[in-house]
From Swiss-Prot:
Its main location: nucleus. One of its GO terms (cellular component) is nucleus. It holds the Pfam family WRKY. Gene3D superfamilies: WRKY domain. It is found in: Nucleus. The gene is WRKY55. Disulfide bonds: none annotated. Residues 133-155 are annotated as: Disordered. This is WRKY transcription factor 55. InterPro entries: WRKY_dom, WRKY_dom_sf, WRKY_plant. Residues 167-235 bind DNA. Transcription factor. Interacts specifically with the W box (5'-(T)TGAC[CT]-3'), a frequently occurring elicitor-responsive cis-acting element. GO terms for biological process: regulation of gene expression. It comes from Arabidopsis thaliana. Keywords: DNA-binding, Nucleus, Transcription, Transcription regulation.
Length: 292
DNA sequence: ATTATTTGACCTAG
DNA sequence: CTAGGTCAAATAAT
């Protein structure tokens, strides 16, 4: 049996794959002129495979979803949902495609990209759903645990002020989701150092980590050190309107570069599958503020 | 029932 | 050996 948590988690993976695909497209696009045919082929292969995988995965998810909710009206709508999501996620990319492939007012380019994949949903490809979904089964119990190497790329240190508002001043909140995995007393520091890693480390090897250390002299300030940039595309939405920086950078030293996407994939999954209980609310098709 | 945090053990570079 | 970083089992939170 599948829980809904599981499914929306799977949805996250699908969205991540799509993001990755789009990234590949962009990178190909920017280096298109000076690309030798061989490497062009390689790039295209990779892109096709990425989207194809996402397509397969999405098909399975929809099969599951449809079989679990006796209702059946999702299919025609999915395309527009995908479009809507893409517009939210990558307006820039959409625009590019409109210009290039002569779309009209609606998002033709991207629509075309996805139509092929999503139409296939109707084709009722009977697949072994269970096999692919519950893959993470038993493995060799004694893996000689690989140890971390030294120096994992860039490093960025930021000083942030603790929140003055009332209570515990501990969690400075950037726009990523972190999972604490350790805490250590540091020699010569009055306060412990906390270790976090990206929550979506599982969504294939997102290496992002951070350390949070309260300053000795100024307990109202934290030193946050970031290591590795996110390869997951699941930043929590920094909505343009809600510019409430709960975290105030005082100063920063940067040696790296990171990409931020506008909307969390997690939220995408919620749009499509809802975050609530099982089999409820088929209105997930429309935006939250839909009048109806 | 799943996901997150806590915390001592464990690991590795120096 | 020590110090800092990470793992993972127990525990808490949702």
């Amino acid at each position: 049996m599948y829980s809904y948590k599981k499914i929306s988690y799977q949805m996250e993976e699908v969205m991540s794959m799509i993001f990755h695909g789009m990234k590949l497209v962009k990178s190909l696009e920017s280096s298109l002129p000076e690309k030798p045919p061989e490497s062009l082929l390689t790039s295209l292969d990779e892109i096709v495979k990425t989207f194809s995988d996402a397509n397969e995965r999405l098909k399975m998810l929809l099969e599951i979803k449809n079989s679990e909710t006796a209702l059946n009206k999702t299919k025609p709508v999915i395309v527009s949902v995908a479009n809507q999501m893409l517009m939210q996620m990558e307006p820039g990319l959409m625009q590019e495609y409109w210009l290039r492939y002569g779309g009209s007012t609606s998002s033709q380019g991207t629509e075309a990209m996805f139509q092929t994949q999503l139409m296939a949903v109707d084709g009722g490809g009977e697949r072994n759903l269970t096999a692919a979904v519950e893959r993470s089964g038993a493995s060799g119990s004694s893996t000689p645990r690989q140890r971390r190497r030294k120096d994992e790329g860039e490093e960025q240190t930021v000083l942030v002020a603790a929140l003055r508002t009332g209570n515990t001043d501990l969690p400075p909140d950037d726009n990523h989701t972190w999972r604490k995995y350790g805490q250590k007393e540091i020699l010569g520091s009055r306060f412990p150092r906390a270790y976090y890693r990206c929550t979506h480390q599982k969504l294939y090897n997102c290496p992002a980590k951070k350390q949070v250390q309260r300053l000795n002299d100024d307990p109202f300030t934290f030193r946050v050190t970031y290591r590795g940039s996110h390869t997951c595309y699941n930043s929590t939405a920094p909505t343009a309107s809600s510019a409430t920086p709960s975290t105030i950078p005082i100063s920063s030293v940067t040696t790296g570069h990171s990409v931020d996407y506008g909307l969390a994939v997690v939220d995408m999954a919620d749009v499509m599958f809802g975050s609530g209980g099982v089999g409820t609310n088929m209105d997930f098709i429309f935006p939250k503020n839909d009048p109806s």
